[in-house]
């Protein structure tokens, strides 16, 4: 760059230097400006021609970078010039630091630091006076205010320092000033209170009353996921924590899990009467008969001993005959010789773990060997590689082969006994959309040829030459690679800005010779000819002269893969129907010319044809980088490039989760997406952090002068630790010209000689290289800090890098002395780093109060309120991010050791824009950082075309979503804390409702932003161009969190209070025509009117909690739209499957029952044999697991707790699982935590009327198997009453069925209790061990004699209910009669004068021992008894869907869909020893 335009400014520099020296007496004096400049320049070169270097000064420009880029005159005003303000880029106005002004800057920093200390002392004094003036100040403990207390204890020292600098050293004057300040503050507080008393007197008094309330967040929102291979802690910010924090959801899960157990009992009774056939082979050999020669000497390869007597064989009338997958004609004399002496040790070559209990699926379900669906080993819960499509376990089969037969390739049957021809027909069949996730197949011919080469070497070791040859076939052509790199740095680079663009392109040019196609072009790719010969020029050789080049190759593969996935044409199509127009944002296509749009479309079409397969990354990281060894064994080869690859690898695993099936070997099949909730990311991030410590990234590079001498020698590899092999022709200089790599060896040696310092031009280039290396150093460190904060926020785990300034002094990237005039987009990256770090500091303040045990154990309400107010000011744009961070520090909410003091010289203009400005930026050419003035047309013409501006705004959009998600979480925590306190302290009802409304507003905001993102990702030149992969999971996760709160509110709106309002039985003695047709028609009419109103509902508006009866319907409409979205996204993203299952689960569960359809269909509609819910399919995978599987689900562990299986193992009585226990200790179980009885914030006076009408409309008769119906009774007896709280708390159990009343022979008598009603004493949890494996004989209610005898055995029940005219008083409905979730009755003697303390088991009755009578339960009767949850009438069909089927042998191991709750069915090591202990092992 020419220096001519700046020669006139030389005298001004000298004059400014002299004036600055005179102003700063502490600065070093200098005689001449030249001497001063040379003294401040790095002493790199001490040669004889030093005088020449002094005459050619290293001058720093005074104009701002933007004006120099636009080549206009700059007025040099601070903090931003007028030209940048007029053009609308004032936030980017940047001045390079002058070397002569360093000492003056230090003095200014000291003044700013003193000013901040004064403000901080005042704020702390105000906070402490507020705490001491509260009524609860006497009980205040030191650990309750760790930050404020510690800071105030040190405030004397700070105050003394302030007074010493201002000239007041007297302690008496210090105390006098402090008292005056306190008096002034008290006067201001009194004045503010009196001024606001008239407006909000009630809210202020309530807020002041409860400000010092303490919350314990260490127990209410913590989960421990117990797996077979360990435990995983999930903190308060994890998406599953809401399952534990909400009492309604906890009770609902308890009800569902107990229902699952009862349904298993029903299934067992149904299946226990079927005849077991153990002598028949489950394989139908008639379809594939063996040859005559083989039939005489060979046996079926299936081990028939594996089929025990307890496994059900296929019936004769099976419509789809099973065909043995083994072709018995293929077994020649040399294949699988029979072992006559060890016949019991023979193993079937068929991998039966792919099927259920050894039974082969029908032909239409046979997996195709050519399909991409991953095979799941349900016995081990591991994800097998997608290549193992053949059902034969080749590991067991090949070891019995002779070597010559195993290597034979002439006959396919000699390798595998499977007749693959019978399976080819199924390859063309379309896979179901909800089971198969389509993987993008490579479309180029070279890629298709690379897969067999990779598969042949997949299980064996590959040499480096073989790996490189395979990668050459997998990589796209050279021109396509250059286009991919340009697309990445243009669109995706701001999301992971840890590379130096020039340096990386130089590496790629050396490794792949990309510039050989067109040596005259400096930046490859964009200006190259588009001829077909250049497009198809393949990669023939990959040069890896250094160890770090392998990591650079891995980074390149990740860039190619991520960029291809992020092309807008590859994004998922989303059609939200009529609501699509509500979520559209203006695009920027109108600002581009038609030729630019056409050129962009051609480039994208070219890139779509060349996909880099994911196997290329697997080969590189396994054989070339050997990343597993580097990250776990040794750090000998760890350098800066290795850290960069590890960060890219982590970023790729989180973004492109569909590729994880071949990249990871996790055992986390319980989660739908192992890429986002897996603990493997925690381990990888910890490895990255340790690598950074090993490389010294936590220390600023200015602390190491030796970097100035070593970087030029190894500038191409910025942190190379050695050369893999001698290559003297390698150019080691960091040359920006692409043609440097094509020069001959003599020019390279000459360039190497130039490092001696004889050429001043090269010295300047080396100094620039040093600064760029230090810049990359700082960017990598702060990106790791941001990764740590994001992981802690996502998983609720503690941060690894706490109190950053205690061990790190690395400066922000803005401290780098780099001239950005040639790289404006790097200037945007630098400013983003500063802004995002400040936002991370705000997030850290929230995480400290929620996740840190020392703070979360006794966090106070006013601290959470302060965090809420500051975050609201930040996201609404009412306060600058610098002011927010300063307020957090002054209020003691953020310690300075976290890094707040590093931002003392931040640019106050560059802040977080408002969300509406971000979304509407493309409309009317609005300025992103407008200051309120109208912009003229001439200014718009001068506006600088900023690179990757849409990507930066998309990142701003994601920051807004994160901040508002935190606001939702904080309001939700306070809401769940104060809502149960309303029954004891009515003043908290106002607080609870305010927090609930705020939580709902922010939840709806996250819901809308999620819809906006996915509704605009396919629009051309939209805000989210090329961000569909990177931001998909964060946006969908926030939308999923929002829906969880919607479920909580729907439960409150439909269930009513937890005191048991309308907890009467829905089972009456009426006939099938007993429905009130007028009530039903009225309900249908009201529902139709509400649906018409919902069609007119604006999804962009907030929902009011005072909506009344329509609240549940409004929220349900949001759930249905989100379910529609996740169903469409499930075709592309694996993690959307889990969220679709979760949403469909609650939609199916909370859907209003259809009474007419249920009454017409009868009992057959509920039979589970061939029934499937029309909305959700295969929902009940996690609930169909066995006992061990459920006990390791964190939701089950929290809802029901652990139950020791001692009861099931003691004795062998058939009814031992249902016998009465003497005490809770004998069961070895723990109790549910006490839950307060209270009314929800959505409860209104109309809830009682609505629930009464619902209960009457839902009333149905009880049907017996013999069709007996009695129409003479209209009594409605409650089947489950909430227990009365004895001390203000009640252990509310899931309200299951206990007894339904029928009038038989003129008297009111109880029916035979269900199996689960006969359990332990009051308060014991229902145990999963009651599911027995023996045949159970129960009395048949259809036989009058047997039924009468069973009634005679129940004398305690008849003493209370024999009178037909007896009605239960209202006091009983209010909780005087207690019935736990197991069904045991316990009434209050003060209420009705009688007590039901015991219940006689049918086991001791005469009829129980009568084998001639057997009880056959009816499923419809069973479902109707258990469809009431705390007044919420759950659809019985939904119960069938969500609870699932019995684990009979026909369904063992089946898992057709991915679950949304983490489960595991293998015992964890170490816990099995505690199963028989006398103390509880949970909580």
Curated annotation (Swiss-Prot):
- Molecular-function annotations in GO: DNA-binding transcription activator activity, RNA polymerase II-specific; RNA polymerase II cis-regulatory region sequence-specific DNA binding; zinc ion binding
Q: Which UniProt keywords apply?
A: Activator, Coiled coil, DNA-binding, Heme, Iron, Metal-binding, Nucleus, Repeat, Transcription, Transcription regulation, Zinc
Q: What is this protein called?
A: Heme-responsive zinc finger transcription factor HAP1
Q: An example of a Gene Ontology BP annotation on this entry?
A: DNA-templated transcription
Q: Which InterPro entries match?
A: bZIP_sf, Fungal_TF_Env_Response, Transcription_factor_dom_fun, Zn2-C6_fun-type_DNA-bd_sf, Zn2Cys6_DnaBD
Which coarse location class describes where this protein primarily resides? nucleus
The entry marks the following residues as binding Zn(2+) 2, namely 64, 81, 84, 93
- Supply any other comment: Heme is an effector molecule for CYP1/HAP1. The repeat region (see FT table) mediates heme induction by masking the DNA-binding domain in the absence of inducer.
Q: Which PANTHER family match?
A: HEME-RESPONSIVE ZINC FINGER TRANSCRIPTION FACTOR HAP1
Q: Which gene encodes it?
A: HAP1
Assigned GO CC terms: nucleus
For this protein, the DNA-binding region equals: 64-93
What this chain does, per the entry, is described as: Regulation of oxygen dependent gene expression. It modulates the expression of Iso-1 (CYP1) and Iso-2 (CYP3) cytochrome c. In response to heme, promotes transcription of genes encoding functions required for respiration, controlling oxidative damage and repression of anaerobic genes. Binds to the sequence 5'-CGGNNNTNNCGG-3'.
Instruction: Locate the coiled-coil region(s) and give their ranges.
Output: 105-134
Cite the binding residues for Zn(2+) 1.
64, 67, 74, 81
């Amino acid at each position: 760059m020419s220096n001519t335009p700046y020669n006139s400014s030389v005298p001004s520099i000298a004059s400014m230097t002299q004036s600055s020296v005179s102003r700063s007496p502490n600065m070093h004096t200098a005689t001449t400006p030249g001497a001063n400049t040379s003294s401040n320049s790095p002493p790199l070169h001490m040669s004889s021609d030093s005088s020449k270097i002094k005459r050619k000064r290293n001058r720093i420009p005074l104009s701002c970078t933007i004006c120099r880029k636009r080549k206009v005159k700059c007025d040099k005003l601070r903090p931003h010039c007028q030209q940048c303000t007029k053009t609308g880029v004032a936030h980017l106005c940047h001045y390079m630091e002058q070397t002569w002004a360093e000492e003056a800057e230090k003095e200014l920093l000291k003044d700013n630091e003193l000013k901040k200390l004064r403000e901080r002392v005042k704020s702390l004094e105000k906070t402490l006076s507020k705490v001491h003036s509260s009524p609860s100040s006497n009980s205040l403990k030191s650990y309750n205010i760790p930050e404020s207390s510690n800071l105030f204890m040190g405030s004397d020292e700070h105050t003394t320092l302030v007074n010493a600098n201002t000239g007041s050293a007297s302690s008496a004057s210090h105390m006098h000033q402090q008292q005056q300040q306190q008096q002034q503050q008290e006067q201001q507080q009194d004045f503010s209170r009196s001024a606001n008393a008239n407006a909000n007197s009630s809210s202020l008094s309530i807020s002041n009353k409860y400000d010092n309330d303490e919350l314990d967040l260490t127990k209410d929102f913590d989960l421990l996921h117990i797996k077979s291979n360990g435990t995983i802690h999930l903190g308060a910010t994890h998406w599953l924590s809401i399952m534990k924090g909400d009492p309604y959801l906890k009770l609902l899960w308890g009800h569902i899990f107990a229902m699952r157990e009862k349904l298993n009992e029903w299934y067992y009774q149904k299946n226990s009467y079927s005849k077991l056939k153990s002598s028949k082979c489950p394989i139908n050999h008639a379809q594939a008969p063996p040859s005559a020669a083989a039939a005489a000497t060979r046996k079926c390869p299936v081990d028939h001993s594996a089929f025990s007597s307890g496994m059900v064989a296929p019936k004769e009338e099976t419509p789809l005959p099973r065909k043995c997958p083994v072709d018995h004609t293929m077994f020649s004399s040399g294949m699988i010789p029979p072992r006559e002496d060890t016949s019991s040790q023979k193993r079937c070559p068929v991998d039966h773990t792919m099927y259920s209990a050894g039974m082969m699926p029908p032909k239409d379900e046979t997996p195709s060997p050519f399909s991409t669906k991953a095979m799941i080993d349900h016995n081990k819960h591991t994800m097998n590689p997608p290549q193992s499509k053949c059902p034969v376990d080749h590991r067991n089969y090949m070891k019995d082969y002779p070597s010559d037969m195993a290597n034979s390739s002439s006959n396919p049957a000699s390798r595998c006994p499977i007749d693959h021809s019978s399976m080819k027909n199924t390859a063309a069949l379309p896979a179901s959309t909800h089971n198969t996730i389509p993987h993008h197949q490579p479309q180029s011919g070279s890629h298709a040829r690379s897969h067999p080469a990779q598969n042949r070497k997949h299980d064996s070791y590959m040499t480096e030459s073989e790996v490189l040859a395979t990668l050459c076939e997998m990589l796209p052509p050279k021109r396509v690679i250059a286009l991919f790199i340009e697309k990445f740095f243009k669109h995706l680079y701001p999301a992971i800005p840890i590379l130096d663009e020039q340096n990386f392109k130089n590496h790629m040019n050396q490794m792949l010779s990309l510039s050989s196609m067109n040596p005259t072009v400096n930046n490859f790719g964009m200006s190259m000819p588009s001829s077909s010969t250049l497009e198809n020029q393949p990669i023939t050789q990959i040069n890896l002269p250094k160890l770090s080049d392998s990591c650079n190759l891995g980074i390149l593969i990740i860039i190619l893969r991520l960029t291809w996935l992020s092309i807008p044409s590859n994004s998922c199509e989303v059609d939200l129907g009529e609501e699509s127009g509500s979520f559209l944002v203006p695009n920027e296509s109108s600002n581009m010319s038609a030729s630019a749009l056409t050129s962009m479309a051609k480039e994208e079409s070219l890139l779509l044809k060349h996909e880099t397969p994911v196997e290329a990354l697997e080969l590189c990281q396994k054989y070339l980088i050997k990343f597993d060894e580097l990250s776990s064994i040794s750090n000998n080869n760890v350098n800066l490039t290795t850290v960069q690859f590890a960060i890219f690898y982590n970023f790729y695993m989180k973004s492109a989760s569909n590729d994880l099936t071949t990249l990871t070997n996790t055992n986390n099949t319980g989660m739908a997406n192992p890429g986002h909730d897996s603990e493997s990311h925690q381990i990888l991030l910890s490895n990255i952090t340790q690598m950074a410590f090993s490389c010294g990234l936590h220390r600023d590079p200015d602390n190491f002068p030796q970097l100035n001498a070593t970087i030029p020698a190894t500038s191409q590899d910025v942190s190379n630790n050695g050369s893999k092999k001698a290559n003297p022709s390698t150019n080691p200089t960091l040359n920006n010209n692409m043609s440097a790599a094509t020069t001959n060896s003599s020019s390279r040696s000459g360039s190497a000689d130039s490092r001696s310092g004889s050429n001043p031009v090269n010295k300047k280039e080396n100094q620039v290289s040093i600064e760029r290396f230090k810049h990359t150093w700082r960017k990598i460190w702060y990106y790791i800090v941001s990764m740590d904060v994001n992981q802690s926020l996502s998983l609720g785990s503690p941060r690894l890098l706490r109190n950053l300034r205690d061990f790190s002094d690395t400066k922000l990237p803005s401290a780098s002395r780099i001239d950005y005039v040639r790289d404006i987009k790097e200037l945007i990256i630098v400013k983003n780093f500063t802004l995002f770090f400040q936002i991370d500091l705000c997030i850290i303040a929230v995480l400290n109060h929620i996740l840190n045990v020392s703070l979360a154990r006794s966090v106070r309400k006013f601290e959470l309120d302060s965090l809420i107010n500051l975050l609201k000011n930040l996201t609404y744009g009412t306060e600058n991010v610098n002011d927010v961070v300063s307020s957090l520090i002054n209020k003691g909410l953020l310690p300075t050791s976290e890094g707040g003091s590093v931002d003392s010289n931040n640019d106050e203009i560059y802040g977080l824009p408002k969300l509406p400005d971000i979304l509407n930026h493309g409309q009317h050419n609005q300025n992103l950082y407008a200051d309120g003035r109208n912009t003229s047309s001439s200014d718009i013409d001068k506006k600088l075309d900023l690179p990757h501006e849409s990507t930066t705004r998309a990142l701003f959009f994601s920051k807004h979503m994160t901040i508002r998600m935190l606001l939702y979480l904080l309001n939700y925590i306070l809401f769940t804390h104060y809502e149960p306190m309303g029954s004891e302290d009515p003043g908290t009802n106002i607080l609870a409702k305010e927090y609930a409304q705020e939580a709902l507003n922010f939840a709806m905001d996250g819901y809308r932003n999620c819809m906006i993102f996915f509704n605009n990702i396919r629009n051309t030149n939209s805000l989210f161009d090329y961000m569909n992969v990177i931001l998909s999971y964060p946006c969908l996760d926030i939308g999923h969190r929002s829906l969880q709160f919607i479920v909580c509110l729907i439960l409150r709106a439909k269930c009513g209070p937890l005191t048991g309002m309308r907890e009467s039985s829905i089972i009456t003695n009426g006939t099938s025509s007993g429905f009130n047709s007028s009530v039903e028609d009225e309900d249908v009419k009201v529902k139709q009117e509400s649906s018409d109103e919902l069609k007119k509902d604006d999804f962009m508006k907030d929902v009011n909690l005072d909506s009344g009866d329509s609240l549940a319907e409004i929220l349900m409409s949001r759930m249905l739209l989100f379910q529609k979205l996740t169903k469409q996204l499930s075709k592309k993203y694996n993690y959307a499957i889990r969220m679709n299952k979760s949403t469909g689960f609650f939609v199916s569960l909370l859907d209003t029952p259809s009474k007419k359809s249920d009454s017409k269909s009868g009992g057959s509609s509920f039979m589970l044999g061939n029934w499937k819910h029309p909305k959700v399919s295969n929902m009940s995978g996690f609930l169909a697991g066995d006992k061990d599987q459920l006990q390791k689900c964190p939701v089950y562990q929290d809802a029901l707790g652990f139950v020791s299986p001692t009861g099931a193992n003691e004795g062998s009585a058939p009814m031992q699982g249902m016998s009465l226990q003497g005490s809770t200790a004998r069961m070895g179980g723990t109790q549910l935590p006490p839950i307060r009885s209270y009314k929800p914030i959505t409860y209104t006076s109309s809830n009682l009327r609505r629930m009464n009408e619902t209960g009457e409309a839902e009333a149905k008769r009880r049907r017996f198997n013999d069709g007996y119906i009695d129409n003479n009774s209209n009594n409605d007896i409650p089947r489950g009453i909430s227990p009365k709280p004895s001390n203000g708390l009640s252990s509310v159990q899931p309200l299951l069925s206990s007894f339904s009343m029928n009038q038989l022979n003129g008297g009111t008598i109880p029916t035979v209790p269900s199996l689960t009603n006969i359990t332990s004493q009051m308060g014991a949890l229902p145990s999963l061990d009651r599911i027995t494996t023996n045949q159970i004989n129960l009395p048949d209610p259809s036989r009058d004699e047997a039924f009468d005898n069973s009634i005679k055995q129940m004398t305690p029940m008849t003493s209370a209910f024999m009178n037909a005219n007896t009605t239960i008083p209202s006091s009983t409905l209010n909780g005087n009669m207690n019935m736990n979730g197991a069904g045991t009755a316990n009434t209050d003697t003060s209420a009705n004068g009688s007590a039901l303390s015991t219940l006689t088991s049918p086991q001791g009755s005469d009829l129980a021992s009568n084998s001639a009578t057997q009880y056959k339960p009816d499923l419809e009767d069973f479902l109707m008894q258990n469809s009431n949850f705390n007044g919420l009438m759950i659809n019985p069909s939904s119960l069938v869907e969500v609870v699932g089927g019995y684990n009979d042998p026909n369904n063992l191991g089946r898992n057709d869909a991915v679950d949304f709750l983490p489960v595991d069915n293998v015992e964890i090591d170490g816990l099995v020893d505690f199963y028989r202990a006398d103390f509880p092992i949970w909580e």
